[in-house]
Amino acid sequence: MELRNSTLGSGFILVGILNDSGSPELLYATFTILYMLALTSNGLLLLAITIEARLHMPMYLLLGQLSLMDLLFTSVVTPKALADFLRRENTISFGGCALQMFLALTMGSAEDLLLAFMAYDRYVAICHPLKYMTLMSPRVCWIMVATSWILASLIAIGHTMYTMHLPFCVSWEIRHLLCEIPPLLKLACADTSRYELIIYVTGVTFLLLPISAIVASYTLVLFTVLRMPSNEGRKKALVTCSSHLIVVGMFYGAATFMYVLPSSFHSPKQDNIISVFYTIVTPALNPLIYSLRNKEVMRALRRVLGKYILLAHSTL
């Protein structure tokens, strides 16, 4: 097949789920609501964790970072998808595609690592409460956050540079919601089998190892919770952990389907649907899952909203 020059002037056409659906208007309205929900809920959660002194704890610092990652992740993808649908213009420049891929990989990989650190935080809090402030000191917590961002950025840079240097064929139509590695490999006019093996190894390392750590952490947590004499303490621990497990299941399930399962196991249409879960649905639901099931967060949100409502009334 004829090759295309990979220059900044060359572009791709993103054929996302909005362009490949029988009811695009309904999907557009749903995505708009979910995006506004993600902006509002993650923004409020970040605000509450930042200004409420009672939430200046390792658990809530990690939760704030999760909200920040979700906010950035969905903003990398959703606004462009919605704007393209309205304009009936689905093109993305070569440079724009590379940037979107880098940012999406960074946010996704950082969240992947952060969720494992959050599981460790819950393990320490429940299984070793007397050592909590030593094992999860502010310094340790910030090291976890920095590790998530730095490792994710390095992985994203490497994969983005390699993928975007592949020779692409004349067909530039990406049947996907965003510029991502699997759909772009389908456009490459080169043998990508070795690179697909590298992606598989990276996927196993960055997805299955954190999942294993999370499962191990919560297995130990479960044994500890079952031995708790207080029903109230047992209930509080289970509520906190179940919230995290719901988030973990949604995120890792979709990411594993996309990056670990062989491409022969899923079609472009299935990939399109799955990408919606980790770019739009999960960022909108994560803060609700955490805040609605956490009394401390709900109290902090009410205090923050109350302050701003009073401030707004006093300025009128």
Curated annotation (Swiss-Prot):
Q: Which cysteines are joined by disulfide bonds?
A: C97-C179
- Membrane topology (UniProt): Multi-pass membrane protein
Q: Which residues lie on this side of the membrane: Extracellular?
A: 1-30, 78-97, 161-205, 266-271
The alphabetical list of record keywords is: Cell membrane, Disulfide bond, G-protein coupled receptor, Glycoprotein, Membrane, Olfaction, Receptor, Sensory transduction, Transducer, Transmembrane, Transmembrane helix
Organism lineage: Eukaryota, Metazoa, Chordata, Craniata, Vertebrata
Swiss-Prot/TrEMBL GO biological process terms: detection of chemical stimulus involved in sensory perception of smell
Q: InterPro entries recorded for this chain?
A: GPCR_Rhodpsn, GPCR_Rhodpsn_7TM, Olfact_rcpt
Species of the source: Homo sapiens (Human)
The family annotation for this protein states:
Belongs to the G-protein coupled receptor 1 family.
* Protein name (Swiss-Prot/TrEMBL): Olfactory receptor 2AG2
Instruction: Explain the purpose of this protein.
Output: Odorant receptor.
Instruction: Extract one GO molecular function annotation from the record.
Output: G protein-coupled receptor activity
Q: Which domain of life is it from?
A: Eukaryota
